[in-house]
Amino acid sequence: MALDGELGEQEEEKKKKKKKKRKKKKEEEEEEEGAEKSSSPFAAAMGEDDAALRAGSRGLSDPWADSVGVRPRTTERHIAVHKRLVLAFAVSLVALLAVTMLAVLLSLRFDECGASATPGADGGPSGFPERGGNGSLPGSARRNHHAGGDSWQPEAGGVASPGTTSAQPPSEEEREPWEPWTQLRLSGHLKPLHYNLMLTAFMENFTFSGEVNVEIACRNATRYVVLHASRVAVEKVQLAEDRAFGAVPVAGFFLYPQTQVLVVVLNRTLDAQRNYNLKIIYNALIENELLGFFRSSYVLHGERRFLGVTQFSPTHARKAFPCFDEPIYKATFKISIKHQATYLSLSNMPVETSVFEEDGWVTDHFSQTPLMSTYYLAWAICNFTYRETTTKSGVVVRLYARPDAIRRGSGDYALHITKRLIEFYEDYFKVPYSLPKLDLLAVPKHPYAAMENWGLSIFVEQRILLDPSVSSISYLLDVTMVIVHEICHQWFGDLVTPVWWEDVWLKEGFAHYFEFVGTDYLYPGWNMEKQRFLTDVLHEVMLLDGLASSHPVSQEVLQATDIDRVFDWIAYKKGAALIRMLANFMGHSVFQRGLQDYLTIHKYGNAARNDLWNTLSEALKRNGKYVNIQEVMDQWTLQMGYPVITILGNTTAENRIIITQQHFIYDISAKTKALKLQNNSYLWQIPLTIVVGNRSHVSSEAIIWVSNKSEHHRITYLDKGSWLLGNINQTGYFRVNYDLRNWRLLIDQLIRNHEVLSVSNRAGLIDDAFSLARAGYLPQNIPLEIIRYLSEEKDFLPWHAASRALYPLDKLLDRMENYNIFNEYILKQVATTYIKLGWPKNNFNGSLVQASYQHEELRREVIMLACSFGNKHCHQQASTLISDWISSNRNRIPLNVRDIVYCTGVSLLDEDVWEFIWMKFHSTTAVSEKKILLEALTCSDDRNLLNRLLNLSLNSEVVLDQDAIDVIIHVARNPHGRDLAWKFFRDKWKILNTRYGEALFMNSKLISGVTEFLNTEGELKELKNFMKNYDGVAAASFSRAVETVEANVRWKMLYQDELFQWLGKALRH
């Protein structure tokens, strides 16, 4: 990125060039002085320079402060000087020979120590500071041309500080034709083979020093060593070939912040097909931000304790050590960590040896890793304790957490299922887990739910710690699925890694899909892959992918900011949905064998999507089927969006239907605005499964491959009284529409005997109908007519699908005058089932009895709908339970509905209840309880309390950074707080963007959550005006937000009157 003041620096440099001769003497004096300077580690790092360091800028005003500093005079220059002495004083031939010999010896000496006297990125020129210094030495540089060849000659006057450079690339007129440091990707000329990384952590002032030795293979001759580095203060760089050839002279080095690379400029070209050893000594901060090597804290027995932990994915390893920070550059790692003996350290591999020192420090040396990428390297320094178990194959599994959490047994559930999951994946993939151990680390603060570091997976506490006495089934399910996801990554992502970030779905899509497959292994009765996958993955991502601003699951990465952008729900959830579709049309057993081959062939390496397609095609071929997987799947992965299939009965020919496909877009007007869509007529090869049925019978399933825009097909047994149903059990990633006659027949079937259709088909019909109506493909009454059958529905999934589909419609209508008509209609559909199911017993403890899961989740869903839409009995019950808790100080609220009761009570009752929940939020130590208490505070109808909570959310000592986003989003979902959250978001945007900007996934979640239910012309105008002043990395998220709000406004303009008219008639009959 361009830095402030860059043009001014160039002008100033031109002036300095004119004065160079006059200043030469002064420069040489300053160079000599600079060679002697050193300072204590990061003396000013936490002071004025800290802001510049954190912002990634140089933090310097001196022109060319980043340029290369002093290096020793070359051999040629010394020889020239001695020749002039010979000529001037007519020295004898013997004297000349003696001087020449001396010059040769000096030349060798300078070559050996050349790197020691070179300048450093983030460090200083002309001799290195002592170990631990900050490298703040004078010097700036330019290239001089003389008879002896090119060299970097420093100019005195610059001052480098931690996180800045003391060297900079040459000016435009001096640059070489090809500059490897300006490219997004590393050149590939060099490949790392092995890293020796030695760290010393100073937890008392949150700094660390490091020494990294990298063995690199030179593939193509080059004069530059370019690797990633950011926010590190480099003190010293050395390069050597091997013992026979010795040191390689270094001319200088500089940091290029636009691409976050360290460039080492050499005096000679490295030879291809040779190996070299690069040594870098550096210092850095243990950051307060949640990326790189960062710090977190917790309170134990009234004392605040700190820990250091890493988050390197996708591009943050470079903030902890200079490295080749791209997934393709796999290498082995040997890590050593020196820390105070009061702490323990963890990394990907087990500790091999620990060396204790008399001064209270210890150095842990970890075993060497297998080949791996930098982004899932990890380490941690903490005061935690652990529990452990061992798998059948001998893998040691440990869970590390705060001592009080371990003592309570909060990590026991995670430890238990992790052991089982490793055994499951080893059997399913037929590839053993590759490391001797797997540590699970629960930390108070983390930018994501979890990170799959190989052998050291890191989780935020809320996604791994579970206290059975206060945790609901819903919370247990969340914890389970996060753990299943991360353990899958030990194979998909860690063992086999995508070549580049454009195919991040190859790891995230598989891990997300296996969340449901792995949970089915743990709890077979839950039917996660066949049922819950629909509502939690398919329906959710199709909402996002139905926008004109969506993108393909495989998307180009053209600049550094694009890398963070690819980690979104399209990669995770659409990737998972496409994998599920692929597994279903291939057949699960063939698909499984294909995955086994894929992992075996590419283990410890990298793979691209074509490698997967080829392996799966071969698996099909061995099974006697010939499908070109790449041809089919490229259309689904390289095109954005998805199709809507429309099945029309042919009125002129019996047993004939017409099938059409078109790109589904929620807002048709957005399609005409998007240039990328105007000239594209997307087509997909669609595996359409189809059945014919009537009131008592359903035919066997048939598959039709639809590849054209319009096709005619003959269907057996299709008569006037029969209905058609497409995309059976919603295994395909598309929607299905029908003519109105067929919709009427399907609605009639649901009302007369819904069990003729499977649970998944019933849920699929509900979601398709609501989405098609929202986009204008169907009349608004069709989905509302479908849900009339729900009073007879006994299964959880259709209720869950209906609840999710009604939610955005409710938010579009909840601030309108005649909202009560919609509210009354929904209550009418819920009332019968609410009375039948009742409330859970007080003694229900969230047991994992599989038979109760579906029933308890159904009961919870119906109670939530009843309380949300104002059922009087539900409100009374919630108020009674809250009042009993306050008066008795005993919480007898059933676990599985606590969040509903807390929210309803805060909404209905007075400020004292809000204050009581606020007090309980502060006093509880159970992370699951803390989360639902905080969210309950956002349910208040009191705008003053909501404003108070929004302001408190910015205090990290009160609300954790990752929880603050949820607070703001939940206030925005409250009709009494939507405008407050929207105003707060705009007023505090600079603070929020600074806090979450680099964690783009969190920033996108915040932008979407605050804006998704804005639906007035005024709010749309405010959003567009706000966007005019912002063009940062979250610009794509704002574009999606604008499209969403435009679609909301358009729907209200076109359809709200139609909806209310129908509702009014329906309630009168």
From Swiss-Prot:
Tissue specificity as recorded in UniProt: Predominantly expressed in brain.
PROSITE patterns: ZINC_PROTEASE
Comp. bias intervals (Basic residues): 15-25
Cofactor(s) recorded in Swiss-Prot or TrEMBL: Zn(2+)
Keywords: Aminopeptidase, Disulfide bond, Glycoprotein, Hydrolase, Membrane, Metal-binding, Metalloprotease, Protease, Signal-anchor, Transmembrane, Transmembrane helix, Zinc
Site feature: Transition state stabilizer: Y572
Primary location group: membrane
Comp. bias regions, Gly residues: 121-136
CDD domains: M1_APN-Q_like (cd09601)
Enzyme class: hydrolase
One Pfam family cited in the UniProt record for this chain: Peptidase_M1_N
GO function term, MF aspect, one: peptide binding
Positions annotated to bind substrate: A449, A450, M451, E452, N453
Reaction(s) catalysed (UniProt annotation): Release of the N-terminal pyroglutamyl group from pGlu-|-His-Xaa tripeptides and pGlu-|-His-Xaa-Gly tetrapeptides
UniProt similarity note: Belongs to the peptidase M1 family.
Record text on subunit structure and interactions: Homodimer; disulfide-linked.
Record's protein name: Thyrotropin-releasing hormone-degrading ectoenzyme
Protein's organism: Homo sapiens (Human)
